[in-house]
């Protein structure tokens, strides 16, 4: 009887442990996978401001390069690749939220012209699917299918991101024309320095909020520091809280000024934006161009043949 009760208790505890583990995994998995899109989507109706600045730069303060490659021209209702490259030194490690060091993630936002959108899976070729890998793209808004976001994803595997894009057909979409259109892209590597609510992350430099003498430095049990700065003139004290991650630059007894850096800047990532142009080409115009080129080539051929015929006539008259 006692063995049966013990077995039931162990079974109950194991079931509870597994359930809690699954819940924690689902919650953390969701928060990590949605972190980059949510930060931009929750705070901004449009990721590109009227000035042309992409809003991701509000949180990722360092400026880094990004590159985009698209075809010069595409035909209507055609799937093509938009390749976004986010280069960085793969040896770099960033400060994670818990203060430890880890690999960098990357993310991107692609702003297409109205009418262009993510290609449906059944229109994507096997070769393109292999280039895309396991990436999962999503629209910035349900009503903005022309704006796509991705990330954060592992930077070591996806520093080059292939977006499968479907071009619109003006025959079915009356608001689309055969024109040259701009495409805008923003790409980041690493964590941001500021959260959307304006608070700092632990991936940035921390400055003194007061001037005076560092009277006390307390190292917290879970990492980070509590720094007390005393004003020698009136004895007023300010306390600056440093989260885990940044390295401390000051020591007790040191005299510091207002806004003087208390830590280093641990950020190794950054954000960049770029643009490209693409032409939505009219098939009739292409056919007309091909017909024109063919007619020019035929005219040249007939001209050469006529010239040879004329030379033969001249040669025969001279011999006569």
From Swiss-Prot:
MF GO annotations: electron transfer activity; heme binding; iron ion binding
Record text on cofactor binding: Binds 1 heme group covalently.
GO terms under biological process: photosynthesis
Entry's transmembrane regions: 286-306
Signal peptide location: 1-35
GN (gene name): petA
Superkingdom: Eukaryota
Pfam family, one: Apocytochr_F_N
Membrane topology: Single-pass membrane protein
Function: Component of the cytochrome b6-f complex, which mediates electron transfer between photosystem II (PSII) and photosystem I (PSI), cyclic electron flow around PSI, and state transitions.
Protein source organism: Drimys granadensis
Subunit comment: The 4 large subunits of the cytochrome b6-f complex are cytochrome b6, subunit IV (17 kDa polypeptide, petD), cytochrome f and the Rieske protein, while the 4 small subunits are PetG, PetL, PetM and PetN. The complex functions as a dimer.
Similarity comment: Belongs to the cytochrome f family.
Keyword rRNA processing among record annotations: no
Protein name (record): Cytochrome f
Keyword Translocase: no
Annotated residues for binding of heme: 36, 56, 59-60
Entry cofactors: heme
């Amino acid at each position: 009887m006692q063995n049966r009760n013990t077995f039931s208790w162990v079974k109950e505890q194991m079931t509870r442990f597994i359930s809690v583990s699954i819940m924690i995994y689902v919650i953390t998995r969701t928060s990590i996978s949605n972190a980059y899109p949510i930060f931009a989507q929750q705070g901004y109706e449009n990721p590109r401001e009227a000035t042309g600045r992409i809003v991701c730069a509000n949180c990722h303060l360092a400026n880094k390069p990004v590159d985009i490659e698209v075809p010069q021209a595409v035909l209507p209702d055609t799937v093509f690749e938009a390749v976004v490259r986010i280069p960085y030194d793969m040896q770099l490690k960033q400060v994670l939220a818990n203060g430890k060091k880890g690999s960098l993630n990357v993310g991107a936002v692609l702003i297409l012209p109205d009418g262009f959108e993510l290609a449906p899976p059944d229109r994507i070729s096997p070769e393109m699917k292999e280039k895309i890998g396991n990436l999962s793209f999503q629209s910035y808004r349900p009503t903005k299918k022309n704006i796509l976001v991705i990330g954060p994803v592992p930077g070591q595997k996806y520093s080059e991101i292939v977006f499968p894009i479907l071009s619109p057909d003006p025959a079915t979409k009356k608001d689309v024309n055969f024109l040259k259109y701009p495409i805008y892209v923003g790409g980041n590597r690493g964590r941001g320095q500021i959260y959307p609510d304006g608070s700092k992350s632990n991936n940035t430099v921390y400055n003194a909020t007061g001037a005076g003498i560092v009277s006390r430095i307390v190292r917290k049990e879970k990492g980070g520091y509590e720094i007390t700065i005393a004003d020698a003139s009136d004895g007023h004290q300010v306390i600056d809280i440093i989260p885990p991650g940044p390295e401390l630059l000051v020591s007790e007894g040191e005299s510091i000024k207002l806004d003087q850096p208390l830590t280093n800047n641990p950020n190794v990532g950054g954000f960049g934006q770029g643009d490209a142009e693409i032409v939505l080409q009219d098939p009739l115009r292409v056919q007309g161009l091909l017909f024109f080129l063919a007619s020019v080539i035929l005219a040249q051929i007939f001209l050469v043949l006529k010239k040879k015929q004329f030379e033969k006539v001249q040669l025969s008259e001279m011999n006569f």
